[in-house]
Amino acid sequence: MEDQEMQLKVKRVTDKFTESMYVLANEPSIALYRLQEHVRRSLPELVQHKTDMQSWEEQSQGAIYTVEYACSAVKSMTNSSLYFKNIDGLLRQAISLKEQISSSQGRSAVINPNETPAHTSVTP
């Protein structure tokens, strides 16, 4: 009876050992199979993420370009304050000259009451 039990235990140990050796011998191929399986499952999702990221990158590059262009426009406007001051001075000078012309026409109308003015203007 002890012999049968011993033989059974020896058989179990040898079977386990044989199974372990078989697994160890075939483990690299199983690992490669699992790796291939994982890549096949994951790759479409990763490709989709990559295309999404490229699309977002293009959109963000467009937005960055727009913001940089707007910033340069604002900087150009702040640098043009000198030109606006010059324009303001010229407009004030033109208004002053127009008022002088209008007042001189008014005096000439008083001097020659027989002439009718060709153009009367109203200044606000």
UniProtKB/Swiss-Prot annotation:
It is found in: Lysosome membrane. Disruption phenotype: Borcs8 knockout results in decreased brain and eye size, reduced muscle size, motor axon defects, anomalies of neuromuscular junctions and impaired motility. Keywords: Lysosome, Membrane. It comes from the Eukaryota. Disulfide bonds: none annotated. InterPro entries: BORCS8. Residues 102-124 are annotated as: Disordered. Signal peptide: none annotated. GO terms for cellular component: BORC complex; lysosomal membrane. Pfam families: BORCS8. The keyword Membrane applies. As part of a BORC-like complex, it may play a role in the movement and localization of lysosomes at the cell periphery. Associated with the cytosolic face of lysosomes, this complex may couple lysosomes to microtubule plus-end-directed kinesin motors, driving lysosome movement toward the cell periphery. Belongs to the BORCS8 family. This is BLOC-1-related complex subunit 8. It comes from Danio rerio. The gene is borcs8.
